[in-house]
Amino acid sequence: MRIVITGATSFVGAAAIQELLENGHEVYAVVRPSSRKLETLTGQEAGKNALREGRLHIVENDLSAPELLTEKIQGSCDAFCHFGWGGSGSGARTGEQLQEENLRASLNTVRAAKALGCRRFLFSGSQAEYGMHQTRMTEETECAPRSAYGEAKLRMRRQGEALCKELGMRYIHLRIFSAYGPGDHPWTLVESCLDAFTGNAALSLGACTQKWNFIYITDLAKAVRALLETPETAFEGIGNPVFNVAGDDTRPLKEFVEEIHRLCKGGGSCLYGDRKENAEGAVNLIPDIGKICRITGWKPETAFGEGIKKTLESR
């Protein structure tokens, strides 16, 4: 398949590209002009080989001008993965104007995907769309986002699906839960724990009593590939285009933190209750991943402890 991917150097984008290249696909990796993170794509063996073989194409283009992609990508493409989204950190999630701009650009990206001949459009939504819940979250669970970020992602789910139907494309909306692994953002909980515990430092945390779920980045990348490769007939009649993408291990967040602490040989310490919650507040993550497993055959393979060990080894 010929696949276009925005947010190509992001944590999720880079992992998805590596997975797709390793499985023989051709990728147009859309990056910001003068991006300083190209090494995330070209530094891996899969990227180096694909560049030599002409299966990896680096396309410089601003997220706000997706219409220009038709001038930079020659020929027809099969699918489009839109991982590009400005301001995903906790602080930027409350910025309504930025999130409105993200939504507008994303809808224009759908139109660009159609112009490129794509038949399938994957969008990276977020668990932040669900808001506060105390019970298991299925794709049918009512959404009540608590930030401008979650609200914009939810609006894209509705408007993006409608636009894709109008243009004759299959819309697939990934609700991604907490991903971790090599290349993760330095401000995430897992990375903060690893920094503190390997550096023998104290880490300020919330109460960490809520239920949580993590997915290792390679498993997430495989889920993206599964949703791209699954035949169209498998999606017929499902109605709701949302797919939860998460791990299969849900437990109190504190247990995950303590497991990281043990794997870091007990260095440093945890100051529970010392930190205020993020933009969405203290949410419970209890995802149901039955739908994606049933329709695509994908399932998470990496146990949390195994993923932490791999992340430590990559440092």
How should each PLM-predicted stretch be described?
Residues 3-23:
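N-terminal Rossmann NAD(P)H-binding glycine-rich loop of SDR-like oxidoreductase domains
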Residues 5-6, 82, 120-123, 131, ...:
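Structural signature of the Rossmann-like NAD(P)-dependent dehydrogenase/reductase core
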Residues 30-35, 63:
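N-terminal Rossmann-fold cofactor-binding loop
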Residues 57-101:
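NAD(P)H-binding glycine-rich loop region in Rossmannoid oxidoreductase-like domains
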Residues 80-82, 86, 107-148:
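Conserved Rossmann-fold NAD(P)-dependent oxidoreductase catalytic core, especially the SDR/UDP-sugar
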Residues 135, 158-212, 217-228, 259-261:
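NAD(P)-dependent short-chain dehydrogenase/reductase
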Residues 152-155:
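Active-site helix of classical SDR
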Residues 200-201, 205-315:
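C-terminal substrate-binding subdomain of Rossmann-fold SDR/epimerase-dehydratase oxidoreductases
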